Regions:
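Cysteine-centered iron-sulfur cluster-binding motifs in ferredoxin-type domains/subunits
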Residues: 181-188
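FMN-binding flavodoxin-like domain, especially the glycine-rich phosphate-binding loop
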Residues: 1-2, 6-14, 20-33, 37-51, ...
Length: 188
């Protein structure tokens, strides 16, 4: 089962792409999160969790959802993380999550998509966005093939800066910048 959270559509695109490639069931957690539901999910096939990177880690809302859900059936878990540039050391945190809830971590796939965190970064234009998505498709295809075969995704090379970004810098971003609060636009 492909379980995803998407804030702006990049992760939804990746999840739908993989769902078609793998002929696997798709679950949009957004509706479930809004309803405050604690889900019981079953999959005989590997779990594929798809989410955006928020400050070099998987979005906390999906990690929290995964922790709260009762997952039965398969014990294998893959993570497909969409980002504007890179995922830092997000794989380590996904592996820790798997250990916490009793799943077998099968790796993380970094999928570069158009930047959309416009409060801090510039979004690319339409032509550049199309080129970025075109480059993401073969990455998704290759990752999907490994998932289909039950193989681990290739290890993501992690350096000291990646550890800092996904560790203390992530915590600072969440404290000061990453907000999911509702916002309002006025004519003022």
């Amino acid at each position: 089962m492909i379980v995803y959270f998407s804030g702006t559509g990049n992760s939804r695109f990746a999840a739908e792409f993989l769902s078609k490639q793998l002929n696997d069931e798709l679950l949009d957690t957004g509706r479930h999160m809004k309803a405050g539901e604690k889900d019981t999910l079953h999959s005989d096939r590997p779990w594929v969790f798809v989410a955006p990177i928020y400050a070099w880690r998987m979005a906390n809302v999906l990690a929290d959802y995964i922790r709260s859900a009762e997952l039965t059936g398969s014990k294998d878990a893959y993570f497909v993380l969409t980002c504007g540039g890179e995922i830092g050391n997000a794989g380590q945190y996904a592996a820790q999550l798997c250990k916490e809830i009793g799943l077998n971590y099968k790796g993380v796939l970094e999928v570069v998509m158009p930047e959309n965190y416009i409060t801090m970064f510039n979004a690319p234009g339409e032509e550049e966005s199309r080129a970025i998505v075109a480059k993401a498709k073969p990455v998704l295809e290759q990752g999907g093939e490994l998932i289909r075969k039950g193989k681990d995704l290739p290890a993501h090379k992690v350096g000291l800066l990646d550890k800092l970004k996904s560790g203390p810098i992530n915590e600072g971003f969440y404290k000061f910048y990453v907000k999911a609060d509702a916002f309002l636009a006025t004519d003022a």
